[in-house]
Amino acid sequence: MSQLLVCRMKPYIQPFERTLALAELSALAHSDPVSVDQHTSNPVLFSIPPVVKPAALARHLAYWETIEADKLYFTTQVLRERTVNVVRNGVPTKDIQQLLFADEIGLPNRRCLRYGTHGIHEYRGKFFPQLVRSLINIADVPKRGIVADPMCGSGTTCVEAILGDYQTLGLDMNPLSVMMARAKCSLLAVSPDALASAYEAIRGQLLRPAGRRSAKLIYFESLPARDREYLSEWFSVQVLQDLD
């Protein structure tokens, strides 16, 4: 493997992300990337010496789409991001796994933040997942190393660490944050078949015609008095019945 590797940067990223993109590529390749398309104001093609296997680069890079070597390698990151397009198209769950690897599913043309379990819960001020991945690359975290986040919020850093095959530790004082972070991380270990089965079961229940609503709030009444008082201030009795 003597030819230069040509890496294509995502063309739609922001200036600060371009800086991170070049920094992560430099850290992983152990050399400074050289612009191939210097005639443009915002070049997206950069070459590096073949000191690292293109497949390894493709597994780690956050802000890049492809690596051209003996063949064209798509980065794992961009393949994960394009899964959002499949789900949004309303494809049946039984067909999703096949379509994820189909050529007709295009690459994203804008920033995608909700792939994997990242879209489960919105958290104000959350990290961009790609930012986390690029910083892990720049920090040169060793294989199976520990990535810790002392204020993990909804778990973006922890999820990216797991996706990158690192160990992770997240801390937060907010119980809701802890619950969401655990849910996001735990789901990554669930088999696709089990997840699809659970989804279809829940979907079936939600789409089932509503029966006669019970006036008794069984789950609501099992909550502590403080929680019942709080929920009653926010929701009407009808909504509480629907939630119950």
List where the protein language model places each region:
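Class I S-adenosyl-L-methionine
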Residues: L5-R8, A27-V141
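Conserved class I S-adenosyl-L-methionine
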Residues: K143-G153
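Short, surface-exposed ligand-recognition loops at beta-strand->loop->(often short) alpha-helix junctions
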Residues: R8-L20
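Class I S-adenosyl-L-methionine-dependent methyltransferase module
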Residues: L163, Q167-G170, N174-D244
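Short alpha-helix
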Residues: L20-L28
